[in-house]
Amino acid sequence: MSYPSLFAPLDLGFTTLKNRVLMGSMHTGLEEYPDGAERLAAFYAERARHGVALIVSGGIAPDLTGVGMEGGAMLNDASQIPHHRTITEAVHQEGGKIALQILHTGRYSYQPHLVAPSALQAPINRFVPHELSHEEILQLIDNFARCAQLAREAGYDGVEVMGSEGYLINEFLTLRTNQRSDQWGGDYRNRMRFAVEVVRAVRERVGNDFIIIYRLSMLDLVEDGGTFAETVELAQAIEAAGATIINTGIGWHEARIPTIATPVPRGAFSWVTRKLKGHVSLPLVTTNRINDPQVADDILSRGDADMVSMARPFLADAELLSKAQSGRADEINTCIGCNQACLDQIFVGKVTSCLVNPRACHETKMPILPAVQKKNLAVVGAGPAGLAFAINAAARGHQVTLFDAHSEIGGQFNIAKQIPGKEEFYETLRYYRRMIEVTGVTLKLNHTVTADQLQAFDETILASGIVPRTPPIDGIDHPKVLSYLDVLRDKAPVGNKVAIIGCGGIGFDTAMYLSQPGESTSQNIAGFCNEWGIDSSLQQAGGLSPQGMQIPRSPRQIVMLQRKASKPGQGLGKTTGWIHRTTLLSRGVKMIPGVSYQKIDDDGLHVVINGETQVLAVDNVVICAGQEPNRALAQPLIDSGKTVHLIGGCDVAMELDARRAIAQGTRLALEI
């Protein structure tokens, strides 16, 4: 069998899991929607149908103080059971199991009635928590147990008690957030009392034939965080209190070390889980950046853990496990760890989806149905939008011919994949290459198509992308001026002193590329831990190395410039932008806003900064100043009476946006 460790059953005593895969908890935003139960039922059922052994729901609060935001989802009353039963019945009909995550967000709750062990404000929240009294703590423990009881009545197979990531239970555990002097604070035995009593109360309420997962923070990655000795002590106490499984938690939300984004190596933290092996007899789950069945199987086969948690990979591909088990791993749409359509959406109050799979969490809104009228369609441009349209339209029965002027598919993805930390884009291109074969798309590369050649098609989809915008600066045609395509696509030589005009996504990518000192650590776990100051020995509190970050300096002197007076990189993703800024600043890259450009000549780039004229004596000026749509074919086709659709950068080119491009291409393909 392929991946024998991954597909081995796991005996929990009172029940058996059919494989070693936990679909980790993700808040989708549907938990608060009026029709959320039906949409979540479809979302989870599709994953259960394709083999997930145990699904964990998005976080549900046990009471009003624990919600993530005002109006957040709770399970604290029997009247809410029918809503949840819709979900559990759908999962069970597909042969899966599902656990409800009980999440009290503590001082991370973004509403004015938040509570915590101590009245200490989180650095990522404007609200200050109320310090819980002894009586309130006892009531909270009962609220957790009540929530678990209601979950059982609603048909859930278990619960996950969320004890990591800096949420309430985690806040009781560390001196960073617990400054109490009563029985709930002080020494570690007191600080862990709340976590243990919650698990004990839940077990007493639900009986012995019900799964209790405890999500244990094994690596806090914050100052004054927990130690490994404390982790062992807590794990043993949690086992004694009645837990069934221990899941790994990595990093608090306020930590300034990346834990799930693309620059994090695959399986980067399974070594943390392995250190707990032998200290408890419960099955251990490891997590974070496990996006590939081979990586998962390797982790299990070498004994790092008993199960793997994969969350975002099931946004990217609901069929991940069934494809792996049936020998079709090359058809898996791999999670690239970008966060652009999942976490970044949740943090602005939108529904989760996935950059590489826009149907995720929208299954009921985007059904895949056979085409009513099969058409002969031309797609011009094999970038993200064109690829997404082509394979989805062909899967519905349309005859699709995909043209591209270049020698390989991918468009801007071929730029992105070269950026250190974005190597996962190779997987996306592998997926599209394979699906072109599977769906029967006719691919014509090295083919600059004309309007006349498109006359025979029923409709044309223009996904012809963008052309870089050339800003009106005197001397813009000077030999030292390069576009980002010259650098990233054509590999033009670049000197040691560089000015980058533009601080959007492309500007940051170009800076990451030009400032990279040697091999990227996104493929090297030890190197990654060293660069970001993670103590691999786990001897230091919080898992932080005494030496701190060791990000090496750039081999080039680079300055990034933008006209806007706002913070450079302000438009980058909420959950990943800080990683790029931190990395570049640590490498010595300068970022200057509010710049006026005067001219470019042999002396360099002439600018005005804070009212002062300066000459930046650089070897090269790299232009990353936006894009214009490439619509050359649109008007001739329209003039000839043909139906034309514009998608991707060809439609809107303000910023290169793969999330929008793939979603637009997919939606059109499902409608045409």
Swiss-Prot record:
It catalyses: a 4,5-saturated-(2E)-enoyl-CoA + NADP(+) = a (2E,4E)-dienoyl-CoA + NADPH + H(+); a (2E,4Z)-dienoyl-CoA + NADPH + H(+) = a 4,5-saturated-(2E)-enoyl-CoA + NADP(+); (2E)-decenoyl-CoA + NADP(+) = (2E,4E)-decadienoyl-CoA + NADPH + H(+); (2E)-decenoyl-CoA + NADP(+) = (2E,4Z)-decadienoyl-CoA + NADPH + H(+). Pathway: Lipid metabolism; fatty acid beta-oxidation. Changing residue 165 to A: Exhibits 1.3% of wild-type activity. Changing residue 253 to F: Loss of enzyme activity. The keyword RNA-binding does not apply. InterPro entries: Aldolase_TIM, FAD/NAD-bd_sf, FAD/NAD-binding_dom, NADH:flavin_oxidoreductase, OxRdtase_FMN_N. SUPFAM superfamilies: FAD/NAD(P)-binding domain, FMN-linked oxidoreductases, Nucleotide-binding domain. GO terms for molecular function: 2,4-dienoyl-CoA reductase (NADPH) activity; 4 iron, 4 sulfur cluster binding; FAD binding; FMN binding; metal ion binding. Signal peptide: none annotated. The record marks 253 as: Important for catalytic activity, assists active site Tyr in protonation of C4. Keywords: 4Fe-4S, FAD, Flavoprotein, FMN, Iron, Iron-sulfur, Metal-binding, NADP, Oxidoreductase. This is 2,4-dienoyl-CoA reductase [(2E)-enoyl-CoA-producing]. The gene is fadH.
